[in-house]
């Protein structure tokens, strides 16, 4: 997965119709995923875990069965594309899209701020977007008002530098981050602990 730039194509929102194929325009085909097994909080929590080595071990009965059981969206790219595929007021396995992704469409759903497991669509804060001494990276909400600031806090120096170098050249592009957000103690500023490069994507 990593944090290599993901070339998402933003498309107008559509109403969620089971079995429809409009999602293929932004890389998300609803028919390729198991909506009923999707658990948003668990999926985002898994993104904070270190990457596991790929295993070629087959599950019993999978090989030669002629059918492949779809999995729920689980990478940041898949979940973000799914959210962009539908209207923010729609639901996916009973979860409101706008309560999974904060973007320009759903910001009205967050009058008091951003708390808990959420994906945010942000941009590099200007003029300064990081604090090397405190290992923090700052983003602003990629919304018309830009009223929220998001702080990515790092314990690992190497990971901090890696993400800083990803964010630095992409000041004009949306940066998508998944995390467990909490108040920073300052008005309209929210923070999270950044643990894995799977938690961030650049949208181009």
Put a short name on every predicted segment.
Residues 1-204:
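Intrinsically disordered, low-complexity linker/tail regions enriched in polar/charged residues
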């Amino acid at each position: 997965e990593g944090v290599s730039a993901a070339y998402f194509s933003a498309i107008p929102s559509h109403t969620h119709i089971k079995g429809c194929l409009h999602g293929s325009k932004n890389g998300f085909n609803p028919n390729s995923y198991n909506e009923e097994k999707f658990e948003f909080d668990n999926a985002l929590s898994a993104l904070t875990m270190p990457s596991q080595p790929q295993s070629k071990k087959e599950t019993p009965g999978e090989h030669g069965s002629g059918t492949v059981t779809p999995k729920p969206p689980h990478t940041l790219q898949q979940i973000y594309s799914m959210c962009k595929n539908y209207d923010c007021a729609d639901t996916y396995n009973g979860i409101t899209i706008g309560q999974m992704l904060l973007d320009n469409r759903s910001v009205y759903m967050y009058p008091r701020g951003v708390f808990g497991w959420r994906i945010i669509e942000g941009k590099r804060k200007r003029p300064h977007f990081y604090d090397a001494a405190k290992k923090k990276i700052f983003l602003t909400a990629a919304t018309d008002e830009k009223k929220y600031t998001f702080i990515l806090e790092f314990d690992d120096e190497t990971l901090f530098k890696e993400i800083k170098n990803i964010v630095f050249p992409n000041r004009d592009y949306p940066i998508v981050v998944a995390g467990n957000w909490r108040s920073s103690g300052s008005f309209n500023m929210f923070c999270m602990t950044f643990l894995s490069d799977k938690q961030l994507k650049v949208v181009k």
